[in-house]
A protein has these predicted regions:
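Conserved, well-folded catalytic cores of nucleic-acid-processing
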Residues: 12, 40, 91-94
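Non-cytosolic beta-sheet module surface loops
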Residues: 24, 76-78
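SH3/SH3-like beta-barrel fold
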Residues: 72-74
């Protein structure tokens, strides 16, 4: 049985990759977003500039765009609640279908955020576990 230290090491070594369709086209084709996130009394997470909150780190890469919508791949270096949603809103490109975080459009009738890849080391066996899904067709067609 692993202690909390062992599980923490497993958590730090995991890889979480998502894809999202965002509104507009980001300035950079790839970037690292580092910000602090806090949660208000209405349970909405947002980026703060005053140094409070927990550090959140997300790396994104543009996969395709039609300038109205962009398909991006997002790698999480931290795993905060609503991290991707809050950070994409903070750079002016909310996730399509995410009215809670500023989206003005809903082309798929749902939040256009999808878990793409999860990799981690099994805490008991030490074996690498890897799970991967395809990018939903609606995501690629929306940003084409």
């Amino acid at each position: 049985v692993l202690g909390s230290r062992g599980l923490g090491d497993v958590y730090k070594r995991q890889q979480r990759t998502y894809v999202a369709v965002i509104e507009g086209r980001p300035e950079k084709d790839t970037d690292l977003i580092v910000s602090n996130l806090v949660e208000n009394k209405h349970m909405q997470v947002y980026v703060t500039q005053d140094g409070d909150g927990k550090e959140a780190i997300t790396r994104y890469r543009l996969l395709q765009t039609n300038n109205r919508y962009s398909l991006v791949e997002l790698d999480l270096e931290t795993g905060r609640k609503n991290q991707i949603r809050a950070q994409m809103q903070s750079i002016g490109h909310p996730i399509a279908g995410d009215s809670k975080y500023g989206a003005e459009t809903n082309p798929a009738g749902r939040l256009m955020l999808h878990a793409r890849r999860l990799c981690f080391i099994h805490p008991v066996t030490g074996e690498e576990m890897r799970f991967e899904t395809r990018i939903p067709e609606k995501f690629t067609s929306t940003a084409k």
